[in-house]
């Protein structure tokens, strides 16, 4: 396994989580959604496995699910997080927890 790719995935993931957490508008989150897409493409290519049950022969890494969940949960509850800026979006917390767990390297 490429340790540089792992370090990059962690650093990019933490940076992305911070950006999602700081986003205050749907426009910002829409822009971040594209960043999430680019990040998950990298994660899937570097660390993904081919799903035997998928019709497509593509690699998939479970960390991708958590990245999309982070931006979607923040978007779905944006009004709440604007009123409560001291709280980290729960989807972002879950993404960071899974990122730090390293379970996605299996």
Short names for language-model regions:
Residues 2-37:
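Short terminal alpha-helical segments
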Residues 62-106:
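Amphipathic alpha-helical binding modules
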Residues 19-32, 47-54, 75-83:
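Charged, low-complexity interaction regions
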Residues 34, 39-51, 60:
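Amphipathic, interaction-prone secondary-structure segments
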Residues 1-7, 101-106:
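Short intrinsically disordered terminal tails
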Residues 9, 13, 17, 40, ...:
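Small side chains
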């Amino acid at each position: 396994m490429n340790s540089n790719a792992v370090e990059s995935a962690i650093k990019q993931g933490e940076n992305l989580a911070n950006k999602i957490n700081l986003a205050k508008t749907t426009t910002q989150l829409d822009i971040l959604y594209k960043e999430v897409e680019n990040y998950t493409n990298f994660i899937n290519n570097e660390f993904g496995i081919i799903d035997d049950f998928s019709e497509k022969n593509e690699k998939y890494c479970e960390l991708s699910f958590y990245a999309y969940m982070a931006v979607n949960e923040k978007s779905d509850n944006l009004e709440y997080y604007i009123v409560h800026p001291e709280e980290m979006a729960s989807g972002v917390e879950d993404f960071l927890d899974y990122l730090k767990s390293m379970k996605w390297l299996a």
